[in-house]
């Protein structure tokens, strides 16, 4: 990744885990961090905002070494017929990127929304 270019940070944040993947604008070169196993070992800490902040600061250091100037952020929740709101680590990760000195371009929500897809789980409610 050359000097002065931008990347795309894909933040997939559920209530069980947070995954941050950084690519260049074409989607080619990838740097990935997952909170489960890579940052914390306890399963109860995987989705916490503190863990997302740690991941984002580690990725910001890697981006600085690679010469990236800033990132566009795409936040994704589980979506589909599951939860449409991102987990607690999404905002913390964005804030940590900004505090670490990474310039932030666009922030998009790319949660998949069904166009009347499959039936959600759970029983019938009358």
UniProtKB/Swiss-Prot annotation:
Top-rank taxon: Archaea
Gene3D superfamilies, A to Z: Ribosomal protein S11
GO CC, alphabetical: ribonucleoprotein complex; ribosome
Coiled-coil features, chain-numbered ranges: none
A single GO molecular function term of this UniProt record: rRNA binding
Region of interest (Disordered), ranges: 107-126
GO BP annotation list: translation
Entry keyword set: Ribonucleoprotein, Ribosomal protein, RNA-binding, rRNA-binding
NCBIfam families for the chain: arch_S11P, PRK09607.1
Family the entry assigns: Belongs to the universal ribosomal protein uS11 family.
Assembly with partners or alone: Part of the 30S ribosomal subunit.
Function: Located on the platform of the 30S subunit.
Family matches, as HAMAP family: Ribosomal_uS11 (MF_01310)
Protein name: Small ribosomal subunit protein uS11
Organism, as annotated: Methanococcoides burtonii (strain DSM 6242 / NBRC 107633 / OCM 468 / ACE-M)
Source taxonomy: Archaea, Methanobacteriati, Methanobacteriota, Stenosarchaea group, Methanomicrobia
């Amino acid at each position: 990744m050359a000097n002065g270019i931008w990347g795309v940070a894909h933040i997939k944040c559920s209530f069980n885990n947070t995954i941050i993947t950084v690519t260049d604008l074409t989607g080619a070169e990838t740097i990935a961090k997952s909170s489960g196993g890579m940052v914390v070992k306890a399963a109860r800490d995987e989705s916490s905002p503190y863990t997302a902040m740690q991941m984002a600061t580690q990725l910001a250091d890697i981006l600085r070494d690679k010469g990236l100037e800033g990132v566009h952020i795409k936040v994704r929740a589980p979506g589909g017929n599951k939860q449409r709101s991102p987990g607690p680590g999404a905002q913390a990760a964005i804030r940590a990127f900004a505090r670490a000195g990474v310039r932030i371009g666009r922030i998009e929500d790319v949660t998949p929304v069904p166009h009347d897809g499959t039936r959600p789980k759970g029983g019938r409610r009358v």
